[in-house]
Amino acid sequence: MGHKDFLHKLLSGDHFSQEEMTQCMNAIMNGVFPDTVIAALLALLEHKGVTSTEVAGAYYSLIAKANTIDLSPDAVDTCGTGGDHAGTYNISTIGSIIANSTGVSIAKHGNRSVTSSCGSADVLEELGFRIDLPVEATVELYARTGFSFLFAPLFHPSMKRVAHIRKELGIRTIFNMLGPLINPARSKRQLVGVYSSELMELYTEVLLQTGTRHAMIVHAMTEEGVSLDEPSLNGPTYIVEIQNGYVCRHTVYPEDFGLDRHPLSAIQGGERKQNAAIIRSILDGSASPAQIDAALYTSAMACYVSGHARCIDDGLTISRESLESGDTDRKFREILDFNAELSARYREAVN
């Protein structure tokens, strides 16, 4: 099929088969289509509504092109879709840092901001973490600390083809959905925050197909009526849990875990300097209760899917103990120090 065939199909409101989506994505990533066509395809897909079959087709295209890394299938990824436009600080990033300090291995897949003011790569860089270490250095960092950040452009070089188009479009696209699925470490334990409730079933279908071991797909609402791609501190959090092929669904509230309710404004952030300052204040204990609770809530879920905690309650307890004792701050300083040592030892891997 040529680009006109793909465009006509989308303009008619028809869905792609898995094979058609793989073919279309291959053409996009291999530079067959010009920028204008790619932008039109991405916008029309989003307008039509992406199906689980289309996401699976795109997944198989991108994962075949990825530079994979050998860590551990039990490492947890907290990469979410982003794109909820709630303006929160980088909660999943600090959540993964806290979880790591409790003994959870982390293989966080992430990138610079596309639809937000500050992506996980942006805030880690602002905190002094070099995000673009070569693969062998990332393996060393993980071996010593159990923490790794998998910078998407390094492991998915074909994504450079669409980076500027995504930035110029400034809207959610199928690539937001793919981020949590194409972890180059092939993580089988995941905490996936999604920006809409409709995506929960889509991710369930795709993760079952791709063989996850234990995943929680999370979507939440606030009292203000705002959708979140992370647990809510003042409204319901909807969870689809997948464990060894079995699926169950939960709805939880902050008070179920002894957490106070806080308005959305209490956990909002901004640009990278502001978000990095919030994370530093969480690490040193000077952050607001809301900022700390949001981080602990996410860490608790990461601890649970890792198998390190028996339940979310247990995960919350060990996360709080690690943060309040100073263990999280000490562990993150260790990560930063070794990251700097590796940075001095290895040449830049990606521009």
Curated annotation (Swiss-Prot):
It catalyses: N-(5-phospho-beta-D-ribosyl)anthranilate + diphosphate = 5-phospho-alpha-D-ribose 1-diphosphate + anthranilate. One of its GO terms (molecular function) is anthranilate phosphoribosyltransferase activity. It is an enzyme of class 2 (transferase). One of its GO terms (cellular component) is cytosol. Anthranilate 1 binds at G80, N111. Belongs to the anthranilate phosphoribosyltransferase family. SUPFAM superfamilies: Nucleoside phosphorylase/phosphoribosyltransferase catalytic domain, Nucleoside phosphorylase/phosphoribosyltransferase N-terminal domain. NCBIfam families: trpD. Homodimer. Its cofactor is Mg(2+). The lineage of its organism: Bacteria, Pseudomonadati, Chlorobiota, Chlorobiia, Chlorobiales. Anthranilate 2 binds at R166. Mg(2+) 1 binds at S92, E230. This is Anthranilate phosphoribosyltransferase. GO terms for biological process: L-tryptophan biosynthetic process.
